[in-house]
Amino acid sequence: RGFGRISGGERQLVLVARALVQNAKILIMDEPTANLDYGNQYRVMAKIKELAAGGYTIILSTHNPEHALLFADKSFVIQKGEFVAAGSSAEVLNEEMMRRLYGVDVRILTTEINEEEARVFVPVGTSARDK
């Protein structure tokens, strides 16, 4: 099928594949998992992590803080066009930052996956600013 006849998620996968085929050692990706279903989001992010481990420099934007927690070493937070924070994803993406960015109270759950610590956010309610 032609590019114009495939779904939005399939188009996004094609765009990611095109970036990889170019063999650039630095990849800048604007929301590479946009329009992808849950499984394909994971596949794309896992491939990005694999590329980073193989020596690629990856810069990507995401509105999914869990992607940054699970797949990124470092995070830079921008809110309303202003630089807010930078550092390791585990340090920067915390409960207070989620409240500040999204107006949602969260708890961070930690587990071990493949002998590595993995952290995920669980929303528990909206913050006082929304009440």
Language-model features: locations:
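Catalytic Walker B motif of ABC-type/P-loop ATPase nucleotide-binding domains
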Residues: 27-30
